[in-house]
């Protein structure tokens, strides 16, 4: 058995983190999971071209899926911090950096690390 390369480890971790956030929002349907897989394929090529970017993969996959969902369904993930008013999506910060977090720019707060949205939402789903 061959050891798993750092690239494959990072891609698997990014996939798992984004899928965890999708599951937390109860939006991990088959077509959405396909969006994750498409992003992973594209980011594999990207990081093969720029190996130093391997630590940025999780945030980039999260952003890719967020963009794909916006085009297909609407904003995701919705902010669990701000109560009433106009629902708005969280953003990933840093846009290109390690340790990505979901942030609410409206409230000016970090909401959760990518992969941990379930804890930020208190484990409950919103309707």
Q: Model regions: which residues?
A:
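Cys/His-clustered metal-coordination modules, chiefly Zn-binding fingers
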Residues: 51-127
């Amino acid at each position: 058995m061959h050891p798993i390369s750092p690239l494959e480890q990072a891609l698997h971790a990014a996939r798992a983190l984004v899928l965890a956030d999708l599951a937390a929002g109860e939006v991990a349907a088959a077509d959405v999971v396909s969006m994750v897989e498409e992003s992973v394929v594209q980011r594999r090529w990207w990081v093969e071209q720029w190996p130093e970017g391997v630590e940025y993969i999780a945030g980039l996959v999260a952003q890719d899926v967020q963009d794909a969902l916006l085009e297909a369904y609407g904003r995701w993930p919705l902010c669990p911090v701000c109560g009433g008013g106009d629902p708005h999506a969280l953003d990933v910060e840093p846009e290109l950096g390690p340790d990505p977090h979901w942030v609410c720019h409206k409230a000016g707060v970090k909401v959760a690390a990518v992969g941990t949205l379930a804890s930020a939402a208190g484990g409950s789903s919103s309707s």
